[in-house]
Each structure stands twice: as structure tokens, then as C-alpha cells.
Amino acid sequence: MSLIVIKPSYLCDEPIRNFAALARALRLEEVVLQDAAVMANSSYRRVVPAPGSTRETFDALGILKVIHRRIKDKIFAKVQFPDYLQGSVKHRDYVSNARKHTNQKILICEDVKKFFPSVQAGNIEDVWCAFFAFSQPVAKLLTQLTTKDGSLPQGAITSSYLANLVLWRDEPLLHAKMG
């Protein structure tokens, strides 16, 4: 029996190889990106948690939030996510996720505690370099722009997309084995 492995894919003619190309792709000036990267850790506000919640979430502020939206619209919009990935994917939600699990013999509902803060900057840089095939300098800059204090900030516009991609090498085979 052969396994059918379906991976996420980046539908783009050419990977981003330098800061000028990144600036063009995001329709921003290079200096804006570089300045925002330097200030990124201090460009978030902590979101007050709902009563009873223990999750620490953050919202990007000012130009960093603009950059996050552009990354979502100009880069993540070109990622084709497999059907088994539902979270934060356009036109997919908890309803479509529930439909996929209707009539299954086993249904497991789990939440990985502190998943976002456990995803380190090195993991994110690997996504930018290996999955997207961006150059190392571009990957480092994007990592600075999309992490807070060295990890993935839960609540940021880009974080769920990156969380979906951080296991891009391993998750497809696991999904195929589980059938």
C-alpha cells in the first residue's frame, strides 16, 4: 500500500532573494522593513485575556501590523495548504473542520499547550529558508518581523500561518499514515 503525501506548496515563480525584492513584494520601502525589524519586539501590545483564559496573546502595532498584513496578503496568499490544515486558512473554519471529522471512528480534540511560544525563531527562519526558498538574509529579516522575543507571538496576523508551516516536512507523512 503506497501512501499519498500531500504537502503545502508555495505557488510563486521566483523566491525572494534580496531586500529589494522583499520590499517590492510587500510594496514597502526597504528602510521601513529594516527599521520595523529592529523595533519588532517592542511593537506589540499584550491582549487582555478573557476571564479564565491562560493564553498570552499579542497584537502587532503600527507599521509592524501593516507589514504583517502585507506578508499575509502577498506571501501567505500564495501558499496552497492541504485540506487537512484548517486553522487560519482562507475559507476554512471550525465548521469545515468539523465536517471533515463527521462519521469518523475516533475523534480526538486536543490543544497543544503553549504551542506558539514553543515555536522558536530558528524554526521560523527555517520555514522562510527551506519552505519558501528565500535567501538567508531575507529569512532572517522576516523572522525578526514575525517573532517576538525569539518565539512566535500568539495572536499576531502571521503567526497561525507560520504555525501551520512549521511542521511542513513531517506533518504530511503523519497525515498520510493516519489516513
Segments (PLM) and residue ranges:
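Short, conserved non-catalytic motifs in the polymerase core
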Residues: R45-H68, G87-K90, Q144-N164
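Conserved polymerase palm-domain catalytic core
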Residues: K100-G179
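Active-site-proximal segment of RNA-dependent polymerases
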Residues: I63-C109, K114, I157-N164
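Short coil/turn segments at secondary-structure boundaries
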Residues: D35, Y84-S88, K140-L142
